């Protein structure tokens, strides 16, 4: 976006801050991640985890989930009002994996939520540190984006599985605030809105009364978030129509699906942040690194540098490929599930393969899985180069009305060509251009038709050596012109909802 007048940068959203200069932002983001690190160290002490066990990503995820659950006020209230069998609303816990006699064993732990909140606040100078919580949510969301497919969720809302590259952040909780809204893809916002409209169609009281007023405010706010992601006037005008509709119904759903399709070529701006597992920040803090003094950024070299010197382990199931498990976590760490594989491979320095070819399941281990044959391995999370994260969507020209990459939502600000079959996309746009949004639809289709596949996105932008922290010498990679690499082709991943 050219106009950054009223917009806050991601880091400001991330730390809940008002407008700050670069140094202040780096300091407050540093404060946020060092709080996460201190909390993690304290939890490892409480649980008496060995150094090795503390570096196990599955243990990190359990500890992260416990603190997120401890601060989930809405759910806590709900659990207290609707007591369910065998669930203590005041407790939280999960599986902790320990090394015993050369084997991994699972131990289920339970803690008072109050106690977890106390440890978290203590690690964060007595504050609630919601920014740190959101940061953990985004890391979990990025991990889900890399691990699961959302075909079923797309189909349920009347969208098309080919729109999977628009679904970033689809598993983020509603309470993830401005930082969460920034990383949600166009498809995710469309899906949330469609679900809302469908409830309104089925439930007459949804928009009525005092609750209905709050619902309406939430609806308009979500519309505005989505509108802010679009970069062309016609797409935004259509969002105004959807937002101002007196009684949102099927016409609005149609408009939203049309907009989601159009975003395959006229890309929305979606933020990308490298959010790492808590254990990585813990390791750095334990080794004496002062994040607040040094400053930290989620979109620059810092996360790459952190991963360069962190050793993280993962449990591996008997027939899984450790290299593939590493790729999954690497993609999650850099929010690169929707990036062009050619770009990811270049930055990582090893070939990144499509999800359909991965011999690995998710990182988390289900409670009914047998631990006997579980092994553990070091995750290879290092990279050959680093690159700046983007939120532009990769449209090519300055009028913002040009081609982005079809099955890709770019993560890195790195020059790439746009190989795409426009005919396959345009086929989805035959037919309906009547109704009150007809002129906007016509305009959007015109812009899409004039998109040229030979264009280049992020012209002149390159990757940087890890020694080049000031980003002075961009290395512009040249990619094989004719194949765009989507992670999702030939997909056989598990569904998120299972």
Swiss-Prot record:
Subcellular location: Virion; Host nucleus
Alphabetically ordered keywords of this record: Capsid protein, Helical capsid protein, Host nucleus, Host-virus interaction, Ribonucleoprotein, RNA-binding, Viral nucleoprotein, Viral penetration into host nucleus, Virion, Virus entry into host cell
Annotated region (Disordered), positions in chain: 1-21
Keyword Acetylation: no
Residues spanned by motif Bipartite nuclear localization signal: 198-216
Signal peptide residue numbers: none
Gene Ontology molecular function, alphabetical: RNA binding; structural molecule activity
Short sequence motif named Unconventional nuclear localization signal, residue ranges: 1-18
Domain of life: Viruses
One record GO biological process: symbiont entry into host cell
Gene Ontology cellular component annotations, sorted alphabetically: helical viral capsid; host cell; host cell nucleus; ribonucleoprotein complex; viral nucleocapsid
Processing and modification events after translation: Late in virus-infected cells, may be cleaved from a 56-kDa protein to a 53-kDa protein by a cellular caspase. This cleavage might be a marker for the onset of apoptosis in infected cells or have a specific function in virus host interaction.
Subunit structure: Homomultimerizes to form the nucleocapsid. May bind host exportin-1/XPO1. Binds to viral genomic RNA. Protein-RNA contacts are mediated by a combination of electrostatic interactions between positively charged residues and the phosphate backbone and planar interactions between aromatic side chains and bases.
HAMAP family: INFV_NCAP (MF_04070)
Assigned protein family: Belongs to the influenza viruses nucleoprotein family.
Function: Encapsidates the negative strand viral RNA, protecting it from nucleases. The encapsidated genomic RNA is termed the ribonucleoprotein (RNP) and serves as template for transcription and replication. The RNP needs to be localized in the host nucleus to start an infectious cycle, but is too large to diffuse through the nuclear pore complex. NP comprises at least 2 nuclear localization signals that are responsible for the active RNP import into the nucleus through cellular importin alpha/beta pathway.
Protein's recorded name: Nucleoprotein
Species per Swiss-Prot/TrEMBL record: Influenza A virus (strain A/Hong Kong/212/2003 H5N1 genotype Z+)
């Amino acid at each position: 976006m050219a106009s950054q007048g009223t917009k806050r940068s991601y880091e400001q959203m991330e730390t809940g801050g008002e407008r700050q200069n670069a140094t202040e932002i780096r300091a407050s983001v540093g404060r946020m991640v060092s709080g996460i690190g201190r909390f993690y160290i304290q939890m490892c002490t409480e649980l008496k985890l060995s150094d090795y066990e503390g570096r196990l990503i599955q243990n990190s995820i359990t500890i992260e989930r416990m603190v997120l659950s401890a601060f989930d006020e809405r759910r806590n209230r709900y659990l207290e009002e609707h007591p369910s069998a065998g669930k203590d609303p005041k407790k939280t816990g999960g599986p902790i994996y320990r090394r015993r006699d050369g084997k991994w064993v699972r131990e289920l732990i339970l803690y008072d939520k109050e106690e977890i909140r106390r440890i978290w606040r203590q690690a964060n100078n007595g504050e609630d540190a919601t920014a740190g919580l959101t940061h953990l949510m985004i890391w979990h969301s990025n991990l889900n984006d890399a691990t699961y497919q959302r075909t079923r969720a797309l189909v349920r809302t009347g969208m098309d599985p080919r729109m999977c590259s628009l679904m970033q952040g689809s598993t983020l909780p509603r309470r993830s605030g401005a930082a969460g809204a920034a990383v949600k893809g166009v498809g995710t916002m469309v899906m949330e809105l469609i679900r809302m409209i469908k409830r309104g169609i089925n439930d007459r009281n949804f928009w009525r009364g005092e609750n209905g007023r709050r619902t309406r405010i939430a609806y308009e706010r979500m519309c505005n978030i989505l509108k802010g992601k679009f970069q062309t006037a016609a797409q935004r005008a259509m969002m105004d129509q959807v937002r101002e509709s007196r009684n949102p119904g099927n016409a609005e759903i149609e408009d939203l699906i049309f907009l989601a399709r159009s975003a395959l070529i006229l890309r929305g701006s979606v933020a990308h942040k490298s959010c790492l597992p808590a254990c990585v920040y813990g390791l750095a803090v334990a080794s004496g690194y002062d994040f607040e003094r040094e400053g930290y950024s989620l979109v620059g070299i810092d996360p790459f540098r952190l991963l360069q010197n962190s050793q993280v382990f993962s449990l591996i199931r008997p027939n899984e490929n450790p290299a593939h498990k590493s790729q999954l976590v690497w993609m999650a760490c850099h929010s690169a599930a929707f990036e062009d594989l050619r770009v990811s491979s270049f930055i990582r320095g090893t070939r990144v393969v499509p999800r359909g070819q991965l011999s690995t399941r998710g990182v988390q281990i289900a409670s009914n899985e047998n631990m006997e044959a579980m092994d553990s391995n070091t995750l290879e999370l290092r990279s050959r180069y680093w690159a700046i994260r983007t939120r532009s969507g990769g449209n090519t020209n300055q009028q913002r009305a040009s081609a982005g990459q079809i099955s890709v939502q770019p993560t890195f600000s790195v020059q790439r060509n746009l190989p795409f079959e426009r005919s396959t996309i345009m086929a989805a746009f035959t037919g309906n251009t009547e109704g009150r949004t007809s002129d906007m639809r016509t305009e959007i289709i015109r812009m899409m038709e004039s998109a040229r596949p030979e264009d280049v996105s992020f012209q002149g932008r390159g990757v940087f050596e890890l020694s080049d922290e000031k980003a002075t010498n961009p290395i512009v990679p040249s990619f094989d012109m004719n194949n765009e690499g989507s992670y999702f082709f030939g997909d056989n991943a598990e569904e998120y909802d299972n």
